[in-house]
Amino acid sequence: MKKIVFTGGGTVGHVTLNLLLMPKFIEDGWEVHYIGDKRGIEHQEILKSGLDVTFHSIATGKLRRYFSWQNMLDVFKVGWGIVQSLFIMLRLRPQTLFSKGGFVSVPPVIAARVSGVPVFIHESDLSMGLANKIAYKFATKMYSTFEQASSLSKVEHVGAVTKVSDQKNPEPDELVDIQTHFNPKLPTVLFVGGSAGARVFNQLVTDHKKELTERYNIINLTGDSSLNELSQNLFRVDYVTDLYQPLMELADIVVTRGGANTIFELLAIAKLHVIVPLGREASRGDQIENAAYFVKKGYAEDLQESDLTLDSLEEKLSHLLSHKEDYQAKMKASKELKSLADFYQLLKKDLS
């Protein structure tokens, strides 16, 4: 039986594509393994998925671009992670390794290269993350969402692979209940921010609940179960799975962070959106670059977190609603998307 090892973690964005690809390989008779951190979100997501995947936990350290005494300890953690990954590779003898990035992916990538296993990487952002910059040196091939410099000879630009499906499924009963609390005459605004990125949106909705629900139907994906609420013109929930796409479709506008996975999902369904990227104090600035790219293309509006107020947000919402046809036309004309089926076929071809 053919074997494939996946790696990637630290954030949902470093796991999502893996979760989409793994069922495809399982259906085609592959034995699927995953290398990550048992304390990381990658382990949680795989357990939640119920997929027939063998998880291997390794030591991992954070890769920092700045001086920290913690770097000294983390060098040893990464080194031990490489040794652990090497033993896993030599024991499994997989046909390939697929990496979605994140700090935990570096040891398996290095170990795969050392043990002669082909390495395929996916980069979602406009600028490469530090983990993928290191991993690129050991890669057989890298697939990118955005076009990269021509000097990166191992990169193939494939566009975004999104988890939003074109298939229309029956509306969940819960969605019907939500809609009975909404005013059909008001625009519906969905706030989605990922695990840590949702906090600023949660605070905005909490602070201005009255004003917001007078003018809009509000959906707030909070990541915090203590905020769960369904009331007039307001639905707040910590986490959704089957409801994710129906809520996207229900919304007239989405207010989101600048992670590549989410904004390309919005592009795929031509959904109006305001991007509030994580600032450089909380990230390496990749979300700011992603947001600027989308604004330049005419797909979205952006708003820096430091400038986020009720008034500034409403100005962006009003502008998008007033120019809805222009934004949607540009999104529908985009050539920057690839279906999961097409990407899977491309990956299988490269593996053969």
UniProtKB/Swiss-Prot annotation:
GO terms for cellular component: plasma membrane. Its EC number is 2.4.1.227. InterPro entries: GlcNAc_MurG (IPR006009), Glyco_trans_28_C (IPR007235), GlycoTrans_28_N (IPR004276). It is found in: Cell membrane. UDP-N-acetyl-alpha-D-glucosamine binds at residues 195, 287. It is an enzyme of class 2 (transferase). It catalyses: Mur2Ac(oyl-L-Ala-gamma-D-Glu-L-Lys-D-Ala-D-Ala)-di-trans,octa-cis-undecaprenyl diphosphate + UDP-N-acetyl-alpha-D-glucosamine = beta-D-GlcNAc-(1->4)-Mur2Ac(oyl-L-Ala-gamma-D-Glu-L-Lys-D-Ala-D-Ala)-di-trans,octa-cis-undecaprenyl diphosphate + UDP + H(+). Keywords: Cell cycle, Cell division, Cell membrane, Cell shape, Cell wall biogenesis/degradation, Glycosyltransferase, Membrane, Peptidoglycan synthesis, Transferase. It is a peripheral membrane protein. Cell wall formation. Catalyzes the transfer of a GlcNAc subunit on undecaprenyl-pyrophosphoryl-MurNAc-pentapeptide (lipid intermediate I) to form undecaprenyl-pyrophosphoryl-MurNAc-(pentapeptide)GlcNAc (lipid intermediate II). This is UDP-N-acetylglucosamine--N-acetylmuramyl-(pentapeptide) pyrophosphoryl-undecaprenol N-acetylglucosamine transferase. The gene is murG.
